[in-house]
Amino acid sequence: MKAEILCVGTELLLGDIVNTNAQYISKELANMGIEVYHHSVIGDNEDRLLKELERAFNYCDLVITTGGLGPTKDDLTKESVAKFFQEDLILHEKSLKQIEKRLSCFNKSMTESNKKQAYFPKNCEILENPNGTAPGFIIEKDNKIAVILPGPPYEMQPMFENKVIPYLEKLTNSTIKSKVLRITGIGESDVADLISDILENQTNPTVAPYAKQGETTLRITAKANSEEKALSLIVPIEKKIRQILGTNIYGSGETSLEEVVANMLVKRNLTIATAESCTGGLLAGKLISFPGISSVFLEGAITYSNESKINRLNVKKETLEKYTAVSKEVALEMAEGIAKSAGTNIGISTTGVAGPSGGTYDKPIGLIYIGLYINGKTSVKELNYSGSRQFIRNITVTRALDFLRKNLI
């Protein structure tokens, strides 16, 4: 089955709202083994929407739309879809009562505009919306399937999970399961090279690498006539990949790197403090986003100037004068200094040149040092990156977390 995702709303075209719906639906369809061929965003215009539907159904079996189901005159998705399928819109009494009941919860009465939301194509399956006043619907005609969903993610996602996924699973006549492995420390091209035999000889399951800033994900997808069989097909491929990539795999599913590191610290009761220069608190921010980290995260210091490194972290003045602030020697003294000052098992530091200015021939933009102190033992990691200031700072945080993780394994 081939699919297109069509997101409707002038606010999306203007950039007022980020289109997270397409990303979410694509991931869910990929989990089901449904190929997404195209994403489209279109304004609230009936003529353009009709043309997009005609174009999409020229090569797709399934079109999923989000948005344009509201009560205002420019919410035209329902009308456009009905016209495309040559269906009349009729009032659905049950939906009308549900909308009226929901409005009453907010001390609002039914208006003619709201009543519009209770009209649907005559031959469709209506999708109830317990989180809003815009029900969705599914219409199937002439081997074409349109799934029409509301725009707000808090309305769309539950509807997709509870109604659309079961509907689509019945159409596929098979069970599709996926397992996502999360990798950091090596790039997508290196991952692809290391598992090239698997990628070149894949059938069922399939293995697909995806890159994002600082990490790579591998999605293993298997299709079978039962969930148990599909999961059993994934096991040997996952085992082989883990043997090849080893500790570069930090987790699976939706697990984040900071969550993995925080769990390691909490489970082992290892206290930690951070000393940051170029990352300016980003590393501490990542760690404290994890619930329960307060039991082990004692302190975070932003020591941007040389004076603060000396006064706060006890970095030696002569070390700074001899090696400069961007050096492995200073990174190590920063990590040890914050650990001893805070009385923690672990101290971790970042120092570097994030740019866009400040680089020299010996200390170019993108040169980063990460210092680590763990119960008396110290180590340091040197990094070299190019890119924007924000990219360099963010990638430094990812590498620092991974450096800590690998030293705790």
UniProtKB/Swiss-Prot annotation:
CDD domains found in the cross-reference section: cinA (cd00885)
Name recorded for this polypeptide: Putative competence-damage inducible protein
Family: Belongs to the CinA family.
Source organism of the structure: Clostridium botulinum (strain Loch Maree / Type A3)
NCBIfam families: cinA_nterm, molyb_syn, PncC_domain, PRK00549.1
Superkingdom of origin: Bacteria
HAMAP family in alphabetical order: CinA_B
Pfam families found in the cross-reference section: CinA, CinA_KH, MoCF_biosynth
